[in-house]
């Protein structure tokens, strides 16, 4: 049986008691006059991991950036529709984008530690936000959550750039955790990592997914199947003028998407017959 709407998980007993953390309502994104993502309506469950999959150019990362208004920083970008967080559209004129980004953190594809010490990488965000608690305790907690503390506890004053690629990415995750977000966005967080580092990040994601709402963009379907609870499949469409834009095809529990998808194009993509 097909779900009633592509952005709503099916109504099975496993899905019945889900709490929605974030919701997009008919969200479209434009770069100048070019439509990049069309009319996406999607409900993201709280304290679960949701994966966005689909071919290049289907709007996964563009939509991800809508959740913390990072598209605001791209010249010519425009978002239509609503992104609902705690009952309010984050694009309303009275909403502070900086506060949105504090509550909805983003980890980029390539590790990007600041040219500062490991300690100051973690402490930077809380300091900027006026944190009044014990900073040493906060730094340790964030590094422990990112499963990095035991590796760096004796060299907190050394540069974050001295760490390996996998350690740098976990440092960036710890930096995000230190601002105490409710939602963590991850844009291909393992794309530049070796298989061992990737496995550690995936194990970390599974642990964090119990306490945070996580949305991950990935081209690695095996990764989506391993770590996510829900999966949204996006595909491209060509408009009348020959320009491509992204659209949501199907959203459901990950096992449904990979084992019994409702749409043929989803099945073709996850089975490797796409294109």
UniProtKB/Swiss-Prot annotation:
Coiled coil: none
Record InterPro entries: AAA+_ATPase (IPR003593), ABC_transporter-like_ATP-bd (IPR003439), ABC_transporter-like_CS (IPR017871), P-loop_NTPase (IPR027417), PstB-like (IPR005670)
Keyword Chloroplast attached: no
One GO BP annotation of this record: phosphate ion transmembrane transport
GO molecular-function terms, A-Z: ATP binding; ATP hydrolysis activity; ATPase-coupled phosphate ion transmembrane transporter activity
Gene Ontology cellular-component terms listed: plasma membrane
Gene3D superfamilies cross-referenced by the UniProt entry: P-loop containing nucleotide triphosphate hydrolases (3.40.50.300)
Alphabetical list of Pfam families matching this protein: ABC_tran (PF00005)
Enzyme Commission number(s) from the entry: 7.3.2.1
Cysteine disulfide partners in this protein: none
Sorted UniProt keywords: ATP-binding, Cell inner membrane, Cell membrane, Membrane, Nucleotide-binding, Phosphate transport, Translocase, Transport
Membrane topology note: Peripheral membrane protein
Similarity comment: family membership: Belongs to the ABC transporter superfamily. Phosphate importer (TC 3.A.1.7) family.
Quaternary structure (record): The complex is composed of two ATP-binding proteins (PstB), two transmembrane proteins (PstC and PstA) and a solute-binding protein (PstS).
Listed PANTHER family: ABC TRANSPORTER I FAMILY MEMBER 17
Function: Part of the ABC transporter complex PstSACB involved in phosphate import. Responsible for energy coupling to the transport system.
Designated name of the protein: Phosphate import ATP-binding protein PstB 1
Protein species of origin: Synechococcus sp. (strain JA-2-3B'a(2-13))
């Amino acid at each position: 049986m097909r779900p009633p709407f592509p952005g709503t998980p099916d109504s099975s007993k496993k899905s019945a008691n889900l709490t929605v953390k974030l919701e997009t309502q008919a969200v479209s994104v434009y770069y100048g006059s070019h439509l990049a993502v069309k009319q996406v309506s999607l409900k993201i469950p709280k304290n679960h991991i949701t994966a966005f999959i689909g071919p290049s150019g289907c709007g996964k990362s563009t939509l991800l950036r809508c959740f913390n208004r990072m598209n605001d920083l791209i010249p010519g970008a425009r978002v239509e529709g609503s992104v609902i967080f705690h009952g309010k559209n984050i694009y309303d004129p009275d909403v502070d984008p900086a506060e949105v980004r504090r509550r909805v953190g983003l980890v980029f594809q390539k590790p990007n530690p600041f040219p500062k010490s490991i300690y100051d990488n973690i402490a930077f965000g809380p300091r900027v936000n006026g944190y009044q608690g014990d900073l040493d305790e906060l730094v340790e907690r964030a590094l422990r959550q990112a499963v990095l503390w035991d590796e760096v506890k004796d060299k907190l004053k050394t540069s974050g750039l001295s760490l390996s690629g996998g350690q740098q990415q976990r440092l960036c995750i710890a930096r995000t955790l230190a601002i105490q977000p409710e939602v963590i966005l991850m844009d291909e967080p393992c794309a530049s990592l070796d298989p061992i580092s990737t496995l550690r990040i995936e194990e970390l994601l599974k642990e964090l997914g119990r306490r945070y709402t996580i949305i991950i963009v990935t081209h690695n379907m095996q990764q989506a199947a391993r770590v996510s609870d829900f999966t949204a499949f996006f595909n491209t469409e060509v408009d009348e003028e020959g320009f491509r834009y992204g659209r949501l095809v199907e959203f459901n529990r990950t096992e449904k998407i990979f084992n019994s998808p409702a749409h043929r194009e989803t099945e073709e993509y996850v089975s490797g017959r796409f294109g």
